């Protein structure tokens, strides 16, 4: 678990500088219009050359992501945006899963739990685990699997 309190924390995870080796990266964020929402910091708190916006989108993912061998699951609203998914693909993610629209927070939790349960306990393929988690209800049905 990594706590993200500033843009450079997310950059460290996406770039691999502060990410432990893991097959799955679950990004639990709020999202809006296909961008991750980060805490807004006071100007004097930002580090030199740090991204200065509470929105972190496809352009920033393109700039920083090095995700070879990692499957990414993002739980925030609208993070299933095609441009964002393409940015993760460009960063060499094995796959990207996220909701295409505003999604209920409880549904996001349930989706991730069911997806991981299917992978771990039932040795399901990624596709089968995704389909079972997506099929729970209309809210979990908002999740999309890219590449």
What are these language model-derived features?
Residues 1-22:
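Functional beta-strand-loop-alpha-helix junction segments that form "active/interaction loops"
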Residues 2-3, 25-27, 73, 96-98:
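A structural signal for short, well-ordered beta-strand segments and their strand-loop junctions
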